[in-house]
């Protein structure tokens, strides 16, 4: 594991206001080693160069850490585990549920979480609109679902009263924000700056219409 990647991750996390130990950083990078190995057998990610993986997978995921509320967080359409797996390493006191409709992706996540000792991660194989958990979640986050309104429509029932839906977006989604389902409102739109990434990033924070902002 090149020390330069450890340093890049630690410095980038610090710039994002996220406190990581060197052990945390090494666990995140170890998860990328597992991703590379599994990616040879199944297409989990098109990003194969390690510097880009650190930036576009790990630091991009950590860019939303300060908006996460616990103790229960759901990552919808987690894919290969982003943003949920890096956030779980950075926030060990919060329970993360990673949901996806593709079983093979969840098999990878279960393997990687076990390999790096992320005991606060569980997986669910279903679609968000079909998921009926015993307890709802304080935060529901996704960087995979398309339009913000669709995300809210599919996953809104999974969020507790007073909780937040967090949609990770690229450019400012002006038109999408005008098409939220009834009963929901935009609490805030945060412009994110991901260290090492020269691309626009925004986080849309959605809550129920009667919730205080």
Model-derived segments and spans:
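Conserved SAM-binding loop of SAM-dependent methyltransferases across substrates and taxa
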Residues: 80-93, 153
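Conserved SAM/SAH-binding loop-helix junction
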Residues: 63, 82-86, 104-107, 150
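Residue-level signal for pocket-adjacent positions within structured domains
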Residues: 13-15, 39-42, 82, 126, ...
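S-adenosylmethionine
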Residues: 93-97, 101-213
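Class I SAM-dependent transferase core
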Residues: 1-74, 104-121
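Alpha-helical structural signal in soluble globular domains
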Residues: 12, 25, 90, 179-183
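Conserved beta-strand/loop positions that form the S-adenosyl-L-methionine
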Residues: 76-78
């Amino acid at each position: 594991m090149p020390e330069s990647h450890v340093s890049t991750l630690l410095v980038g996390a610090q710039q994002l206001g996220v406190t990581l130990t060197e052990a945390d950083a090494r666990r995140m990078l170890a998860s990328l080693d597992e991703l590379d190995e599994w990616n040879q057998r199944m297409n989990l990610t098109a990003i194969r160069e390690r510097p880009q993986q650190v930036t576009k997978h790990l630091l991009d995921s950590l860019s939303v850490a300060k908006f996460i509320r616990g103790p229960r967080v759901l990552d919808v359409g987690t894919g290969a585990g982003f943003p949920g797996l890096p956030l779980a390493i950075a926030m060990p006191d919060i329970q993360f549920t990673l949901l996806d409709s593709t079983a093979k992706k969840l098999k990878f996540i279960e393997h990687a979480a076990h390999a790096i000792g992320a005991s606060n991660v569980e997986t669910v194989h279903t679609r968000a609109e079909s998921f009926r958990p015993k307890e709802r979640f304080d935060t529901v986050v996704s960087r995979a679902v398309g339009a913000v309104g669709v995300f809210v429509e599919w996953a809104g029932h999974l969020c507790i009263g007073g909780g937040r839906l967090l949609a990770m977006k690229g450019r400012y989604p002006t038109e999408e924000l005008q098409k939220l389902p009834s009963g929901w409102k935009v609490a805030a739109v945060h412009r994110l700056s991901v260290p090492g990434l020269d691309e626009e990033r925004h986080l849309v924070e959605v809550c129920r219409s009667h919730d205080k902002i």
